[in-house]
UniProtKB/Swiss-Prot annotation:
Annotated localization: Cytoplasm, Perinuclear region; Cytoplasm, Cytoskeleton, Microtubule organizing center, Centrosome
Bias type Low complexity, positions: 376-388
Protein name per Swiss-Prot or TrEMBL: Ubiquitin carboxyl-terminal hydrolase 20
Region (Disordered): 95-142, 247-296, 368-388
Main location: cytoplasm
Annotated SMART domains: DUSP, ZnF_UBP
Record bears the keyword Ligase: no
E.C. number: 3.4.19.12
Catalytic reaction annotation: Thiol-dependent hydrolysis of ester, thioester, amide, peptide and isopeptide bonds formed by the C-terminal Gly of ubiquitin (a 76-residue protein attached to proteins as an intracellular targeting signal)
Protein residues bound to Zn(2+) 2: C30, C33, C53, H60
Stretches with biased composition (Gly residues): 286-296
One biological process term in Gene Ontology: regulation of G protein-coupled receptor signaling pathway
Gene Ontology terms, MF aspect: cysteine-type deubiquitinase activity; cysteine-type endopeptidase activity; zinc ion binding
Organism (species): Xenopus tropicalis
Amino acid sequence: MGDAEDFCPHLDSIGEVTKEDLILKSKGTCESCGVGGPNLWACLQDGCQSVGCGESYVDHSTLHAQAKKHNLTVNLTTFRVWCYACEKEVFLDPRGPPASQTTSPRLSHRDFPTSAHPLKSVPIAVGDDGESESDEDDIKPRGLTGMKNIGNSCYMNAALQALSNCPPLTQFFLECGGLVRTDKKPALCKSYQKLISELWHKKRPSYVVPSSLYHGIKLINPLFRGYSQQDTQEFLRCLMDQLHEELKEPVPLETQEREEEDRDDQREGERGGTVEEDFLSCDSGGEMGDGEGGGGVGTLSEMELLIREEVGRGLSEKEKLKERKLSYCHRRTSSEQADEDADVDTAMIPEPDNDAYVHCSSRSCSPHPVESISKHSSTPPRSSPLRTSHSYVLKKAQVLSGGKKRSEVRYRSVISDIFDGSILSLVQCLTCDRVSTTIETFQDLSLPIPGKEDLAKLHSTIHQSAVSKAGTCGDSYAAQGWLSFFMDYIRRFVVSCIPSWFWGPMITLEDCLAAFFAADELKGDNMYSCERCKKLRNGVKYCKVLRLPEILCIHLKRFRHEVMYSFKIGSHVSFPLEGLNLRPFLAKECVSRITTYDLLAVICHHGSASSGHYISYCQNVINGQWYEFDDQYVTEVHETVVQNAEAYVLFYRKSSEEAERERQKVVSLAAMKESGLLQFYISREWLNKFNTFAEPGPISNQSFLCSHGGIPPNKYHYIDDLVVILPQSVWEYLYNRFGGGPAVNHLYVCSICQVEIEALAKRRKTEIDTFIKLNKAFQAEEAPSVIYCISMQWFREWEAFVKAKDSDPPGPIDNSKVALTKSSGQVQLKQGADYGQISEETWNYLLNVYGGGPEIAIRQTVAQYQEAEHLHGEQKIEAETRAG
């Protein structure tokens, strides 16, 4: 650190500052806006006590430096010094303190990491999920903050408290706040980030008022406007959908290809790989397809054994029809998400002529209309719209669906990384034995609560046959511990001693899962449209989990809505606090290794279907105790209170002792402080996954790198929010353990991307300026001889591109949806088509740039114009004659 280039001439302006002073300031707030840490900045000018926020908020520290001409500032989280005049990180030289100074050590260059960049750091596997258990946390742990009821907002408060106690999500907003960037209104992610910071701040109040998020959700969905009671599950879906939309980023093509290769290799190793089996692969989209015979998973004989084994295990036919009817009544009324709650059985959609069909999976799409609804969909799972992130597709479906003009872009976000899983559905025609496969992404599982008859069927069939399989529902109780087992035994004994007409049947969460995954007979009004038979046939539907989410959200269907009335199912459903085992419900193709879950939070509803009150029980990640969150009141409760609760929504998190050992290993390596010649940059977001996920997946540095290996120019100004520096030993351990990458030792702005950005900006300006010029000339024409028609769907894509709202240009002009081709070959405009009118010059310009078609021209000859004028004159004379 003694190089001349590292010396800053402004160091003489620093006053007497001790490290204790800075630690004390780090516990304060920004003097301008009042926001708390982390990453506050303190001015080092002699005599100045200013503390301001950084770029993650308003950046009052920079505003202060510019206004007061104070050059040096220190980050109160990392203790790194930045000089605004030199525009670089500087290091304090180790000059000794004056004789009059106290024994407190003065800040020197030894107090700062030796790095060329003022990077903020994420704790590596510190304690439990990065939470420091200080003495203050032992007295009153962080996170125990209530929320004020803003007029029947208990449904929102309960949901927010449950999400707040999901460590992977909360740690992202606390530790990776710089990644929370969006230009989409109402910027709900910013409101949520602020709320989480308030809930988990050391200097937290007893309760907060979530007014910003409350008003933001009302702008998004009219359903939540007003002050009437709403469904907490509806709120959860709306909130997480919006957070995903605001935080989503495209998945790099290289990542998609690597994931596909890895999963293909895994399938080849596990199954031996036949031609039919190769149809299953990983790709973009949440699409679905079907294959002949055993085209989905395994051979046809294996399919038949799996499916026929489950026939007759499901709910009664009467209950199925009722479920389908009720599911329609429970759809959302929002215009943007009108069908998102519907339990759609996508496998019963009438199929096209080929052997595969593609399911609409992007968020802008709506589900296909169907007449039949099955209890097996996970509401539906995420049927409208399904997310594209981390979803699967059948290669056969992709090939036969026809080439797309624009390649489908996969998106991911912290929401999809945490909550998204996938389900494999199989539908078999009982006449020709044809099997179709459907792979869908879900964000939550909406489970039916089986009745007395259905429960008896489940216990007599599924539980008996499951004994011969690897893993049973009963295995999920093995990890609960003796206390939980004993309490559960007592509860079952008490229930058995009381007549069933008084108490009702004993229902477990495993029973609800078994009912959800049980085979569904497709017959009567619910017959299956078989492509091979070309008619409706009896069939059977069977589904399994293909990929488990990091946090499993389970919704119990307690509310039923009939035509004339609604009612609530008040049956108690027992659920395990630890060791929920989903292995019995996994497909052979499942890519998840960890299958056990521990409970994080449960939302309960007290009252009837028309009115009531929501509360939540959550386990604090710091001390492991359970607390009741009832609006602004937070009370510690015993775990037996939680187990006896009337659960409505449950949040389970993957549990893994191996992941804990991995974190401790990394902590040990980091503490050794072995000197290495190289330091490595790693994605801050992935490191947060390592700290909080049971299965973080391969290292992914693409979040801050472009395809050329550099930093995209638009990310360089906040690169310190995206990366963390690791010692060589820690990087090598993580890389050898998880793979991925790429390795990064040097950060630089990508010059290739800079040239591409400038060229793209020039292209956008040229196209929009040319269009405006030609369109003005077109508007000035009084009687154009020809008018060209263009599809507004394509035009809106082009407009979004030239206005920089979409990074990718549109494909070729596509007028197929507004064109009608006659038998003579003449192309005409469809009646009622969504089109726009442009001039011939504008059409030729766009056609030369993008190509496409077909051309739709409306020509007006002079004869036609004169004939129209003559007819108009005759009508005028006739009208005057009648008036006379």
